[in-house]
Design a protein with these regions (language model features):
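Sec-dependent signal peptide recognition
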Residues: 2-8
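N-terminal signal peptide c-region/cleavage motif recognized by signal peptidases
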Residues: 13-18
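Short glycine/threonine-rich turn/loop motifs
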Residues: 19-117, 182-299
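C-terminal capping alpha-helices of c-type cytochrome domains
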Residues: 21, 130-177, 265-281, 285-296
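Second-shell loop/turn segments in exported
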Residues: 30-33, 50, 121-123, 130-134, ...
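Short capping loops/turns at secondary-structure boundaries
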Residues: 104, 126, 136, 140, ...
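Conserved nucleotide-diphosphate donor binding/catalytic pocket of glycan-assembly enzymes
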Residues: 111-128, 143
């Protein structure tokens, strides 16, 4: 995509817990069973940055989703425990609160569900189970105090439900809006964009048809349709192997194979895309439309 199009999509705002969203964003969806509170957000931030939640004590969520790198790692594929690499790019956490599904193949529906998987993946944080996380959460004095204050729980009553809810609450504060584009399109500031950027936006809407997938609504723009598309990248290189790969994967899945571990552990399996979740042939090689917010620093 030409640079003149993307320049105005890059404003980054780390929003504190608040009752209003930056210009250009819809109301923040917050689960009824996990309301935002400042104390919960602070606990989630601590958990997000805790490197003890890995087999070597070196990898935290923030390792692949670094604040100074727009909550990604700026690598083609992420590097986890002992330098092991996965098969997919680390998506930014910014605005993930608005996404209707998590991971590139949408295998989890919420931030709460998503947050527990990297802990157990052999190429990410590589814990054998969640027990090491819970041991720390239940015995660390600071965590004991925080979980008691936020959830009214301590000891064995603290589970991964509380851990995941705190992490998700923190992640819901990582939002980006109020960019020059937002001020131009939603705020009516005609001078917020340069003439070149205005021409780029016209191309984005019309000849380029970028907006077909990177949608702009009347009152907000997340620049994604939340859908899954096969644009031929990756899977076309192994087209003749796809039938065998798909069949083998379905058989393994029927035997109880873990989708998260399978797609991050094998590059060819990873190329199956959304099919690995739904088993629908039409979704072979399909991946979630990425947001264009902050694309200048995350691409």
């Amino acid at each position: 995509m030409p640079a003149k199009i993307v320049l105005f999509l890059t404003a980054f705002i780390m929003a504190p817990w608040a009752n209003s969203e930056p210009l250009g964003l819809p109301p923040l969806p917050v689960p009824v069973d996990n309301p935002q509170t400042p104390e919960k957000i602070a606990l989630g931030a601590k958990l997000f940055n805790d490197r003890r939640f890995s087999t070597t004590g070196e990898i935290a969520c923030a390792h692949c989703h670094a604040p100074e790198k727009a909550f990604t790692d700026l690598k083609t594929v992420s590097e986890g425990i002992n330098g092991l690499t996965g098969t997919r790019n680390a998506p930014t956490v910014i605005n993930a609160a608005y996404f209707k599904s998590q991971f590139w193949d949408g295998r989890e529906p919420s931030l709460e569900r998503q947050s527990t998987q990297p802990l157990l993946n052999p190429v990410e944080m590589a814990l054998p189970n969640h027990d090491p996380v819970l041991k720390i959460a239940r015995t660390d004095p600071d965590y004991q105090k925080a979980f008691r204050a936020v959830f009214g729980k301590s000891g064995e009553a603290v589970t991964m439900v509380e851990v995941s809810r705190a992490i998700a609450a923190f992640e819901r504060t990582l939002i980006a809006g109020d960019s020059p584009f937002d001020r131009y399109y939603f705020g009516g500031e005609t001078g917020a964009l340069t003439p070149a950027q205005v021409r780029g936006f016209a191309l984005f809407l019309n000849e380029g048809r970028c907006v077909s997938c990177h949608t702009v609504e009347q009152d907000h723009a997340l620049f994604t349709d939340h859908r899954f598309h096969n644009i031929g990248v990756g899977i076309n290189q192994i087209q003749d192997q796809v039938p065998g790969l798909a069949t083998a994967f379905l058989e393994a899945k029927a035997r109880g194979a873990n989708v998260d571990k399978a797609v991050l552990g094998d590059k060819k399996t990873s190329e199956l895309g959304r099919f690995a979740v739904t088993s629908l042939v039409d979704e072979l090689g399909a991946f979630k439309t990425p947001t264009l917010r902050n694309v200048a620093v995350t691409a």
